[in-house]
Design a protein with these regions (language model features):
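Eukaryote-biased recognition of intrinsically disordered, low-complexity regulatory segments
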Residues: 1-23
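Flexible glycine-/small-residue-rich
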Residues: 7, 70-72, 101
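Short, solvent-exposed loop/turn segments that connect beta-strands within catalytic domains
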Residues: 13-16, 74-78, 92-93
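A surface-exposed, charged beta-strand/loop segment in the N-terminal or early-internal portion
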Residues: 79-105
């Protein structure tokens, strides 16, 4: 498969950025989106050009670091998956693909496709602890939780903190992220004040 890539390039946070066009050829349909960017970067390095900076960590869909706007959609053409879980078979051979960083004041661009995610880190660091001794794990059957409540809690806990909600929200609000974090716990009976 062959693709034309329109990629946002920006030297640093203060520089004015813009789109640059690249071609990648002979890409397998089973290549992940990030692997395709790796191939592009290998080609650029071989040509003596600067590679495209992009963020990633686990490449398994659990960390949310690979956050990109692909053709105007957060994480690309699929629903409920991160960029690293997108495979090139989702795109038509010969397609032009536009790749941008998150567009939100909460995530200022550092370089190319890399954004500063510290705003979400601050939210996570602001809470998430209790002041009592927890001792050992309580008996799982001591406080029965209805399956519907447990299912809703698990759905909310599926949030990996990637920032897609804030990046696609016209207000750039991180409240969807905070709501997912809080909702995952709010549905579960705690049994004590805290």
């Amino acid at each position: 498969m062959n693709f034309t890539l329109k990629i946002w390039r920006q030297k640093d946070a203060k520089a004015k950025g813009g789109f640059e066009t690249y071609k990648v050829e002979n890409i397998s349909a089973d290549t992940s989106f990030l692997e395709m960017l790796d191939i592009l970067n290998n080609n650029l390095i071989h040509e003596g050009k600067e590679p495209v900076a992009f963020d990633h960590d686990c490449r398994e869909g659990i960390c949310g670091m690979c956050s990109l706007h692909i053709d105007g959609h957060a994480h690309g053409p699929s629903q409920a998956v991160t960029t690293c879980q997108i495979y090139m078979r989702k795109f038509k051979d010969g397609a032009t693909i536009t790749i941008e960083p998150w567009r939100s004041a909460a995530f200022p661009v550092i370089k190319d496709l890399v954004v500063n995610r510290s705003s979400y880190d601050q939210i996570l660091q602001a809470g998430g602890f209790i002041s009592v001794r927890t001792n050992s794990v309580p008996d799982g059957n001591a406080i029965p939780i209805p399956k519907a409540d447990a299912d809703e809690s698990m759905d909310a806990a599926a949030c990996v903190g990637c920032g897609a909600c804030a990046a696609t929200c016209k207000n750039g609000s991180a409240m969807l992220f905070v709501a997912a974090r809080v909702s995952s716990l709010a549905k579960l009976t705690q049994g004590r004040v805290e």
